[in-house]
Amino acid sequence: MALPKNLIPMPRSRFLRVKCIDCGNEQIVFSNPATTVRCLVCGATLVEPTGGKGVIKAKILEVLE
């Protein structure tokens, strides 16, 4: 009997480093937010919640592990 490779599955959510399109501010956000995430400098919406993965409205620079 073969054992599964991953006994403990890894989460599908990630932290993302994004760049605001309006002001260029870099900020770290969660990929599955429960509330709307806004830019700390200009207040533009970066990520909107959808019940699962959020709609990312900023440029993704890096996916953090």
Swiss-Prot record:
SUPFAM superfamilies: Zn-binding ribosomal proteins
Alphabetically ordered keywords of this record: Metal-binding, Ribonucleoprotein, Ribosomal protein, Zinc, Zinc-finger
Transmembrane regions: none
GO molecular function, one term: zinc ion binding
Cofactor note: Binds 1 zinc ion per subunit.
Segments forming C4-type zinc fingers: 20-42
Amino-acid positions noted as binding Zn(2+) in the UniProt annotation, renumbered to this chain: 20, 23, 39, 42
GO biological process, alphabetically ordered: translation
Protein's UniProt keywords contain Ribosomal protein: yes
InterPro entries tied to this protein: Ribosomal_eS27, Ribosomal_eS27_Zn-bd_dom_sf, Ribosomal_zn-bd
GO CC annotation: ribonucleoprotein complex; ribosome
Cofactor(s) the protein needs: Zn(2+)
UniProt family annotation: Belongs to the eukaryotic ribosomal protein eS27 family.
Record note on quaternary structure: Part of the 30S ribosomal subunit.
Name by which UniProt lists this protein: Small ribosomal subunit protein eS27
Organism field: Thermococcus onnurineus (strain NA1)
Lineage start: Archaea, Methanobacteriati, Methanobacteriota, Thermococci, Thermococcales
